[in-house]
Amino acid sequence: MPIQVVSADFDKTATRPEEWPRGATPEIAFVGRSNVGKSSMLNALARRKGLARVSSTPGRTRALQFFDLSYRPTPAARPRAIRFCDLPGYGYAKVSRAERDRWTAMIEDYLRDRDVLRAVVLIVDARHAPSESDEDAAAFLVSAGRRLVVAATKTDKLPKARRVLALQQVERALGLARGDAVPFSAVEGTGTDALWARLAALAAEEARTAEADPPA
């Protein structure tokens, strides 16, 4: 049954750890190359057009963008809180080396140190094999001990006969098991429910673990 989104709102922009939102709300981060479709994916998941600004200009997002959502996993369930974080896209060349280094440090600090971060969605373009930057991002997330969910976006731009092969190419390149990558298209509306189901399960799993094994 599809997740019901109760509310979705922009929270804040942050460039330093002291600006990150406080509280214990489980967080999901979204990362990928510039112009891979992160904003479109966020809007589709939120069931709200315009929540995350979609731009045709790569590299527009230059800070961490936080969004607060509440959802019901089933119609009878009480609303649960979750927060999404949109990270600046990597692989954008038209900025100075110093600016790229600043972005990299900001993103890596967040991915290593954010204690409420439950999973990271790595977004890749289904039309192409994962880039070296995509592979590096996946390796970094694994080394940082983060739960990784891979979403292959823009599947609407592929003939249906090629979609399965495209997903298998992504899974092989990133060392995933068959069926691990989530096919996604904001245009067709496909993949939204499957991705939501994974993210909600990860958030709930972490919450149950914390309740069963509280810190000393």
From Swiss-Prot:
Protein name per its UniProtKB record: Probable GTP-binding protein EngB
Gene3D superfamilies: P-loop containing nucleotide triphosphate hydrolases
GO molecular function: GTP binding; metal ion binding
Domain of life: Bacteria
Matches recorded under NCBIfam families: GTPase_YsxC
Residue positions binding Mg(2+): 39, 61
Protein family membership: Belongs to the TRAFAC class TrmE-Era-EngA-EngB-Septin-like GTPase superfamily. EngB GTPase family.
Cofactor: Mg(2+)
Chain ranges of the EngB-type G domain: 24-205
Function, in words: Necessary for normal cell division and for the maintenance of normal septation.
Species assigned in the record: Anaeromyxobacter dehalogenans (strain 2CP-C)
InterPro entries: G_ENGB_dom (IPR030393), GTP-bd (IPR006073), GTP-bd_ribosome_bio_YsxC (IPR019987), P-loop_NTPase (IPR027417)
Keywords assigned by UniProt, alphabetized: Cell cycle, Cell division, GTP-binding, Magnesium, Metal-binding, Nucleotide-binding, Septation
Any single Pfam family the record assigns to this protein: MMR_HSR1
Entry's Gene Ontology BP terms: division septum assembly
GO cellular component, one term: cytosol
Residues that bind GTP: 32-39, 59-63, 86-89, 153-156, 184-186
PANTHER family on file: ENGB-TYPE G DOMAIN-CONTAINING PROTEIN, MSS1/TRME-RELATED GTP-BINDING PROTEIN
Lineage: Bacteria, Pseudomonadati, Myxococcota, Myxococcia, Myxococcales
